[in-house]
Amino acid sequence: MLSDRKRAQLERELAKTISSLEGRQAGQLLKILGDPPKLDDITLELWETMGKEMLGVLTPATINTSLLAAENVVNSIPIGVNWDMVNQRAASWASTHNSRVVREMYGNTSQAARDMVADFYEQGLSVGDLRRRLQQRFGPMHSEMVAVTEVTAAAVEGGRIVADELAAEGVTMIESWVTQRDERVCPICYPRDGKVLGDGWTRIDGPPAHIRCRCDTAYKLPPMETE
């Protein structure tokens, strides 16, 4: 589990990097679309290239976040784990997870670009209107939402990797859902706060339970049995 301060730092850093990349990609799209805009040169290869660029941002950031969260869990208990396995699992998860995230992200952006160009002709938009809409699509809010969601996903995965490694050794940890417990907690996550895995939620439910979810998971060893 990450501290609030570390989480905020990781979110800011990732949002800044994503924003820089998306700003450049928005400019590239506008240049290729031309005036008047045409979709002829917006190819699948272009979207794939942009996706690879985003993977280059998300993958190292999420691996780092997962390992930081895993380290925090290990430091909170008197049992160690095979750190090489933790590293391998963090990298494997990041590769699979980020590929899915990027595929969905640029699939949605590709459709949005087609819709914007259609609106340009059907609704009589100006090139300036098109530019503003595209820049909003790639704007700071989008970057922040991606950063918050993916920091949450990576932090939670880091804790789960440690818990699963210990479970393989016969040590079952207690996993609990933890919200930020502030005025921004949503109605989806609020009922799950403090509840252990299996009590109204499964790992499929999250965290993250939704875009911009700021929740985390906490781990502790079960009580020692005494005779």
Describe the residue ranges of each PLM region.
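Acidic, glycine-rich two-metal-ion catalytic cores of nucleic acid-processing enzymes
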Residues: 136, 141-227
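N-terminal leader/targeting and assembly helices and adjacent pre-domain segments
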Residues: 1-137, 222-227
